């Protein structure tokens, strides 16, 4: 009897440990990383980098795009509740000077170019397009209800999102599958591609701003301090 009891205890312990490990793995796969550095190649080979960092329930997303003659820096930050990002601010800095910004408070958003601003009430969620990329990544590409997108200068209502297919994508010398979506933003569209094998990180972001089209394609990935390849 003693032998049976002695054997049963470690087996049950192993089963519990396995269940906990599986649960933790699933939670990690569905959630947001502690940190990520994504390097992109933009139109005409223009380099771009996007970093995501979190500390407790706080997050910061910084995207840098080097265009001829100057650099653009987009920064947004706020809090995380579950897998939901709740922004507090968004800044568009060009050539080291503030170009536009948005500040969020409840259902109110104050936005505009530097030196001018206006405040609007929104009935749903308002995100910048980089924060939206991570929001979609963490929630299996489910669009928040009543969504508006801001670029700091204006507000754009989002009328829907459609999946436009899957394709093989080259990242860091390897190939992985990405799922592509188009988000209807005002009168134009923003296209996102997500890589399921890499926790749905944004593999491509294509959008238009101030008459210029930016097509950012992922070239390398570092998640939680470790380089990731297909």
Set out the residue ranges of the language-model regions.
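Short, small-residue-biased leader/transition segments that mark boundaries at the very start
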Residues: 2-9
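N-terminal secretory/membrane-targeting helices
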Residues: 12-13, 52
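Cleavable N-terminal signal peptides
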Residues: 16-17, 27
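Acidic, serine/threonine-rich low-complexity disordered tracts
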Residues: 30-106, 141-230
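Acidic/charged, solvent-exposed loop-and-adjacent secondary-structure segments enriched in E/D, K/R, S/T
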Residues: 110-132
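Beta-strand/loop-rich accessory regions of lumenal/periplasmic or secreted enzymes
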Residues: 132-140
């Amino acid at each position: 009897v003693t032998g049976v009891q002695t054997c049963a205890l470690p087996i049950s312990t192993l089963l519990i440990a396995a269940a906990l490990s599986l649960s933790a793995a699933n939670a990690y796969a569905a959630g947001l990383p502690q940190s990520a550095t994504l390097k992109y190649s933009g139109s005409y080979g223009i380099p771009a980098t996007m970093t995501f960092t979190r500390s407790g329930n706080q997050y910061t997303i910084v995207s840098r795009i080097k265009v001829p003659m100057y650099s653009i820096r987009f920064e947004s930050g706020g809090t995380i509740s579950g897998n939901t990002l709740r922004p507090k601010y968004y800044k568009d800095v060009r050539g080291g000077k503030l170009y536009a910004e948005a500040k969020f408070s409840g259902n109110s958003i104050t936005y505009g170019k530097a030196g001018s601003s206006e405040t609007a009430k929104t009935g749903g969620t308002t995100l910048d397009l980089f924060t939206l990329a991570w929001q979609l990544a963490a929630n299996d590409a489910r669009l928040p209800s009543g969504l508006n997108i801001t670029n700091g200068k204006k507000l754009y209502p989002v009328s829907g999102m459609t999946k436009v297919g899957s394709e093989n994508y080259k990242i860091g010398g390897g190939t992985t599958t990405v799922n592509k979506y188009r988000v209807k933003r005002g009168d134009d569209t923003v296209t996102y591609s997500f890589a399921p094998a890499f926790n749905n990180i944004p593999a491509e972001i294509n959008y238009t701003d101030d008459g210029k089209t930016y097509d950012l394609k992922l070239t390398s990935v570092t998640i939680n301090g470790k380089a990731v390849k297909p």
